[in-house]
């Protein structure tokens, strides 16, 4: 992608979109009733475990199509685990009749939100498309693997969406903008803290993490570091959008589209700069991959800054997502990580078996001890309710 051939069952892969859409609709309906467990079960447990098990089993059936089939199997499994609680919660839609007029009204009302989501999705695909125009398929494959590793912290934000939505809508009705700013700041800090911790744990021993896929993937470590940093940079935009979709949906959409243009320009510009760097020819593609990831990080960071400032202006309140404890935790985890990765190459397993838990443990302890206040801990307990 986009310069690889289409073979076998690749042609039928677009049909999987129906399972993706149906799952999203079912989980959204469950989130409306504060059923977060079903989302976690379908997205964080069933889907990844199904694709992992199916990939290992179907490899013996078809080395070429096995991964595609395992991906489709994971989508089907997630759909089943979303439909079952949906039926238990809502039952069957007896007496329902389709209405084209009503559907068009709903679609028109939600078009800015859907387009903003599409722009966010596109930002995670635009980098692959740009890289594919300049680099070989092998480099694109290495970048894709790094992208999948970096997508782990990205998935954290979805678990907080059902928390912010009701709080924002309720306080918008009463015009309690100070409470909205407070909640956005708190949840924003939670997401940034969680994503930064995972980014440190995966990024510092990045060579060992990428080496799990094979020695040829180690060259994607720089791209992995930039991609992990990009997810942290995007956290502020994520929580700001939770309120902007209600208060300024069209401006939010325009910012999202504008950031796609910024990403494309910066990424291509950085790739052009690689040509001016004295690099051995066999490493040019890896430098280009790092350049594309850096372009994504820059565009997401700019988007976060613009969206948070827009929301702050609309609310008339500052949005505080950063706390000093975060810097202390990052510095301490980084020092520990650098000490761990200094072990001899023959002990690389130590970086993963001991280093990753140690980095997460120290980082998490500092955040919990000095970053979280009583209100944060109370809100986490309320989340369970």
Predicted regions and their residues:
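Interfacial segments at transmembrane-helix termini and the short loops linking adjacent helices
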Residues: 1-13, 177, 202-232, 279-287
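Interfacial/gating helices of multi-pass transporter permease domains
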Residues: 7-8, 68-69, 101-113, 131-150, ...
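Hydrophobic alpha-helical transmembrane segments
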Residues: 11, 41-90, 150, 258-265, ...
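Membrane-interface junctions at transmembrane-helix termini in multi-pass inner-membrane proteins
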Residues: 20-43, 225-259, 263, 311-318
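Helix-loop junctions and terminal segments of transmembrane helices
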Residues: 31-32, 146-188, 241-246
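Interhelical loop/hinge segments that connect adjacent transmembrane helices in multipass membrane
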Residues: 60, 64-71, 82-124, 163, ...
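Alpha-helical transmembrane segments of polytopic membrane transporters and translocases
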Residues: 111-112, 127-128, 141-158, 189-190, ...
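Membrane-proximal transmembrane or re-entrant/amphipathic helices at the cytosolic face
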Residues: 318, 323, 338-385
């Amino acid at each position: 992608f986009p310069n690889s051939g289409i073979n076998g069952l690749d042609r039928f892969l677009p049909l999987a979109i129906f399972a993706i859409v149906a799952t999203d609709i079912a989980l959204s309906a469950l989130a409306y009733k504060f059923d977060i467990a079903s989302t976690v079960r379908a997205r964080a447990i069933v889907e990844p475990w199904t694709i992992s098990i199916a990939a290992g089993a179907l490899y013996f059936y078809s080395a070429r199509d096995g991964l595609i089939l395992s991906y489709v199997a994971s989508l089907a499994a997630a759909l089943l685990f979303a439909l079952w609680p949906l039926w238990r919660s809502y039952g069957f839609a007896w007496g329902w009749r389709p209405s084209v007029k009503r559907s068009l009204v709903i679609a028109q009302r939600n078009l800015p939100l859907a387009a903003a989501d599409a722009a966010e999705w596109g930002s995670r695909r635009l980098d692959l498309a740009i890289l594919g125009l300049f680099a070989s398929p092998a480099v694109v494959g290495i970048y894709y693997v790094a992208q999948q590793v970096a997508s782990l912290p990205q998935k954290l934000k979805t678990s907080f969406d059902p928390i912010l939505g009701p709080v924002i809508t309720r306080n918008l009705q009463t015009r309690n903008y100070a409470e909205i700013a407070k909640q956005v700041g708190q949840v924003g800090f939670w997401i940034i803290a969680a994503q930064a911790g995972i980014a440190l744990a995966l990024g510092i021993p990045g060579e060992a993490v990428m080496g799990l896929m094979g020695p040829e993937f180690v060259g994607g470590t720089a791209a992995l570091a930039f991609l992990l940093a990009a997810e942290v940079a995007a956290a502020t935009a994520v929580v700001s959008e939770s309120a902007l979709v209600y208060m300024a949906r069209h401006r939010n959409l325009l910012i999202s589209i504008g950031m796609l243009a910024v990403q494309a320009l910066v990424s291509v510009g950085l790739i052009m700069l690689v040509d001016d760097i004295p690099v051995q020819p066999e490493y040019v593609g890896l430098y280009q991959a790092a350049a594309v990831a850096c372009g994504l990080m820059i565009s997401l960071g700019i988007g976060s800054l613009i969206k948070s400032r827009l929301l702050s202006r609309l609310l008339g309140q500052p949005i505080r997502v950063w706390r000093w404890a975060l810097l202390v935790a990052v510095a301490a985890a980084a020092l520990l990580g650098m000490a761990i990765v200094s072990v001899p190459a023959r002990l690389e397993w130590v970086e993963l078996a001991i280093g990753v838990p140690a980095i997460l443990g120290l980082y998490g302890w500092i955040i919990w001890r000095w970053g979280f206040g009583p209100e944060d801990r109370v809100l986490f307990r309320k989340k369970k309710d």
